[in-house]
Amino acid sequence: MKVVHTVGKRRTAIARATATEGSGKIRINKKPLELMEPKYIKMKLMEPVILAGEILGSIDVDVDVKGGGTVSQMDAARTALGKAIIEFTGKMELKEMFLSYDRTLLVSDARRTEPHKPSKSSKGPRARRQKSYR
C-alpha cells in the first residue's frame, strides 16, 4: 500500500497531508471537504481537486492543519493537498498544470511576520513617533 506525506506552510499555519490508496475521500481536520465553511475557503480548497479531475478517484487524502488563522490554514492545506496529489500520482503534466494555474498549489509562501524591534516593541517592528514640521 502506497503512502505519501507532504507539508504545506503559510505564515504560522502548518498543514500535514497523508495520501493513501482509497476511494477519493478528502478530509481536512477529520472533516469532509464538502462540509467546509465558509464557502470561500471550501472553493479555494476545491481548486486542486477540480484540476486533478478523475485522478483523485483512487486517492484518499487526510490533512491536519494547526496554527495560524482560517485563511492561512486554508492556504497551507491547499499547498499540502496539491503536493500530495502530485507526489502520489507522479504525473509531470499535472504538476505543470498546477504551476501554470497557481504556483502556491505546490510552493509554500515564504513570507513571515517581521519581528518587533526593541524601541516600541508592543506597537510593531517599525513604529516611530510622528514627526512634526511646525
Swiss-Prot record:
<dbReference type="Pfam" id="PF00380">
    <property type="entry name" value="Ribosomal_S9"/>
</dbReference>
<feature type="region of interest" description="Disordered">
    <location>
        <begin position="109"/>
        <end position="134"/>
    </location>
</feature>
<protein>
    <recommendedName>
        <fullName>Small ribosomal subunit protein uS9</fullName>
    </recommendedName>
</protein>
<dbReference type="GO" id="GO:0003735">
    <property type="term" value="F:structural constituent of ribosome"/>
</dbReference>
<dbReference type="InterPro" id="IPR020574">
    <property type="entry name" value="Ribosomal_uS9_CS"/>
</dbReference>
<dbReference type="GO" id="GO:0000462">
    <property type="term" value="P:maturation of SSU-rRNA from tricistronic rRNA transcript (SSU-rRNA, 5.8S rRNA, LSU-rRNA)"/>
</dbReference>
<dbReference type="GO" id="GO:0003723">
    <property type="term" value="F:RNA binding"/>
</dbReference>
<dbReference type="InterPro" id="IPR019958">
    <property type="entry name" value="Ribosomal_uS9_archaeal"/>
</dbReference>
<keyword id="KW-0689">Ribosomal protein</keyword>
<dbReference type="InterPro" id="IPR014721">
    <property type="entry name" value="Ribsml_uS5_D2-typ_fold_subgr"/>
</dbReference>
<comment type="similarity">
    <text>Belongs to the universal ribosomal protein uS9 family.</text>
</comment>
<dbReference type="InterPro" id="IPR000754">
    <property type="entry name" value="Ribosomal_uS9"/>
</dbReference>
<keyword id="KW-0687">Ribonucleoprotein</keyword>
<dbReference type="GO" id="GO:0022627">
    <property type="term" value="C:cytosolic small ribosomal subunit"/>
</dbReference>
<dbReference type="GO" id="GO:0006412">
    <property type="term" value="P:translation"/>
</dbReference>
<dbReference type="InterPro" id="IPR020568">
    <property type="entry name" value="Ribosomal_Su5_D2-typ_SF"/>
</dbReference>
<feature type="compositionally biased region" description="Basic residues">
    <location>
        <begin position="118"/>
        <end position="134"/>
    </location>
</feature>
